[in-house]
A protein has these predicted regions:
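PDZ/PDZ-like groove recognition
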Residues: 36-71, 275-280, 285
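PDZ-domain C-terminal substructure recognizer with occasional recognition of PDZ-binding tails
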Residues: 28, 36-38, 71, 91-130
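Serine endopeptidase catalytic core focused on the charge-relay Asp
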Residues: 121, 125-296
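Short, surface-exposed secondary-structure boundary micro-motifs
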Residues: 81-82, 107, 250
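Hydrophobic beta-strand signal
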Residues: 76-78, 103, 246
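Conserved PDZ fold ligand-binding element
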Residues: 65-87, 297
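Short, Lys/Arg- and Gly-enriched loop/turn segments at beta-strand edges
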Residues: 82-93, 114, 256-258
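Gram-positive cell-envelope targeting signals
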Residues: 1-32, 36-38, 143, 166
Length: 297
């Protein structure tokens, strides 16, 4: 009976725990459920094109990138054979071109392709190709579980996507950072709400090694969040049942608390939208604090 209860908590603890580990369930017997927020910093593999925009030249508007076939959501990984990993790298290569055509290596929908772009000189004399790009991101999310044997973790239950394009951020490297919840933007009808976190870059807890549709994954380098916690048995996805459950979450400071929820629906593992389960918050204390499930939980 005790093991059954522990298994029930393990599979319903953080919305998508069982879905995150279902592919590994045959190999992993137990995991430590966490529920603590963490800061997440990621550097992109290449430079993500967020917007295409006109270059203002003395002759009028020019659209070098758009006219060459570059699209929003593309990732630029090299310029004329030179790898770029930041906006600064990209701008330097465009400046070095002196207005001569450059070959951009792009990744679009997982496939590589090359396009030739001729930079335009703007009204200030700088060479530009007419894009707004992003090379990194930072935010907070919830650490879902840690494998006590290896220190490997899973977090979020969904991938980290660029807020402008919706494209999964191509990961070069990243880190988890100790975080505290400073405030909560309550969820309302039509507005998801969000946890507002505070973190500093010198309190690293682990690495981010994968950014996937199912969540982010990596290895903990600091065990302070889970060294005193116990592991619970892992269930297969087909063992999940609807009904009462509990979640662990951190919505004030650095305190992790249990709250009551109800698992309303369980989706099949091959769900086309990648859903794991639908839950309804039944705990009045959590509803009073957050209005329900909010971003970052």
């Amino acid at each position: 009976m005790q093991q059954s209860k522990a298994k029930k908590i393990a599979i319903s603890l953080l919305l998508t725990l069982a879905m995150l580990v279902s592919a590994q369930a045959a190999e992993i017997s137990s995991l430590i459920p966490i529920g603590h927020t963490v800061g997440i910093q990621m550097s992109a593999e290449g430079v993500l094109v967020v917007h295409l925009r006109a270059v203002q030249t003395p002759e009028g508007e020019a659209w070098p990138a758009r006219d060459a076939g570059v699209s929003e959501g593309d990732t630029i990984v090299s310029v004329s054979g030179t790898e770029v990993s930041s906006n600064d790298d990209l701008q330097k290569q465009i400046a070095f071109s002196g207005g001569q055509p450059v070959e951009l290596e792009l990744v679009r929908d997982g496939a590589h392709q090359n396009v030739t772009v001729t930079p335009s000189q703007d009204e200030d004399g700088a060479y530009r190709i007419g894009i707004l790009a992003r090379d990194s991101m930072a935010g907070i999310g919830t650490l879902t579980y840690v494998d006590p044997e290896t220190g490997e973790y899973g977090s979020l239950g969904h991938g980290i996507c660029d807020s402008e394009t919706g494209v999964l951020m191509p990961l070069k490297e990243g880190s988890l950072i100790y975080s505290m919840v400073g405030s909560v933007q309550r969820g309302e009808a039509g507005e998801p709400g969000a946890l507002q976190g505070e973190f500093t870059a010198d309190s690293t807890l682990g690495t981010v090694e994968e950014n996937t549709e199912s969540g982010i994954f990596g290895t903990m380098t600091d065990a302070s969040l889970y060294s005193s916690l116990e592991a619970v048995p892992v269930a297969d996805a087909d063992e999940i049942r609807t009904g009462d459950a509990e979640i662990l979450t951190n919505v004030e400071g650095d305190a992790v608390e249990k709250y009551s929820v109800q698992v309303v629906k369980v989706y099949p593992e091959d769900d086309e939208y990648g859903r794991g389960m639908m839950i309804r918050v039944t705990d009045q204390e959590l509803l009073d604090k957050t209005g329900g499930i909010v971003q970052g939980m």
